[in-house]
Amino acid sequence: MMKLYDFPGAPNPRRVKIFAEEKNITLELINCDMAKREHKSPEFLKKNPSGKIPVLELDDGRCISESIPICRYLESLVPDPNLFGEDAFEISFIESRNRHIELELWTQI
């Protein structure tokens, strides 16, 4: 089972969890306590050298970091329902909303 390194309450892992739920994908949640700086431990830095959460660890041990690339990976595994858009306009519109959230809204949190 794929593992999602998470910190409860953090917005980026929450995005991945919502996405996985919509896809009916079960992920093992691994709490990485940022208050204790577990995300900066040598073990975690092997999974993601930037020391950021979320990280998706695949069954073969490879890791994907950042919420959008993780969601795109999950989309490729389970294409229905399509959550990234089906035509050029939908894809562009969804991408623009994602960028707005990342650059305008979450920078204020």
Show the residue positions of the predicted features.
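GST-like domain detector, emphasizing the conserved glutathione-binding G-site
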Residues: 1-109
